[in-house]
Amino acid sequence: MKPSTLLSLLVAGTTTAWKLDIHASDGRKVSTHGTRDSGCKNIEFTPVLNVNRANFKPATDLYPDPKTFELYVNKGCSGLSYRNGKGDWRLTPARKIRSYKVY
């Protein structure tokens, strides 16, 4: 095995990513993850998710940890509905969410 391949495997095995789990009141869940800012991401569920909980774990290796996640009413990240940081959050009342950002 080439040293560069071995190094890649070692780094891949130890790299962690931020994680955002979005829970809907009907039991559906969206799990997302990454190592850098997400940019705007649409959530493609029909019917739309009625979100009542979000769990954000921002820890990453090798990259600065993101501080914030945002949930939006509309696709394309318009109509900000909720913003928070690290933790497990209850959204009361539940709200319809169609997109998100992590940064």
Where on the chain are the PLM-derived regions?
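Classical eukaryotic N-terminal signal peptides for Sec-dependent ER targeting/secretion
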Residues: M1-L9
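Compact beta-sheet-dominated domain cores in extracellular/mature segments
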Residues: T5, T14-Y103
